């Protein structure tokens, strides 16, 4: 099964929010070569896999506003070096949650790539403040977009 088949170890105080199951989405440009396994094209898919395995390997959880650093740029053609999870943009109301037949819910999160200074800003402030600065940024990945924290 996919990531949503695994129940994540969500802190007890958040149990009421049904955050144990998640699936990830990333918006790539229509001309992105998803079949090219060179790192300049493959890193978004690699990160979907890394993130899907992370809660299992670390017995932890991923949710809204969480960031994961790479420590270095994803590929030679971009300075992006980390990701943040947000609610999917440009979807119909309610499309960010899927109700399962047994009553459990799967939450969908959009993966957005960040620059190192944006990661640092989020850690120093919070996800909400960073997203406020990103309100003009397209939800579609643009490896050449300007940083919102320079």
Annotate the PLM regions.
Residues 1-21, 25-150:
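Acidic, proline/glycine-rich low-complexity IDRs
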């Amino acid at each position: 099964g996919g990531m949503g088949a695994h129940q994540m170890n969500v802190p007890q105080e958040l149990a009421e929010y049904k955050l144990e199951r998640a699936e990830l989405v990333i918006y790539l440009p229509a001309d992105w070569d998803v079949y090219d396994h060179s790192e300049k094209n493959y890193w978004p898919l690699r990160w979907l896999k890394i993130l899907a395995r992370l809660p299992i390997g670390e017995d932890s959880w991923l949710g809204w506003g969480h960031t994961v650093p790479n420590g270095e740029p994803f590929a030679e053609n971009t300075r992006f070096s980390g990701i943040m999870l947000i609610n999917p943009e440009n979807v119909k109301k309610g499309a960010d949650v899927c109700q399962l037949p047994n009553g459990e819910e799967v939450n969908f999160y959009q993966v957005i790539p960040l620059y190192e200074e944006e990661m640092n800003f989020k850690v120093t402030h919070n996800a909400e403040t960073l997203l406020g600065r990103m309100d003009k940024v397209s939800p579609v990945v643009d490896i050449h977009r300007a940083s919102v924290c320079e």
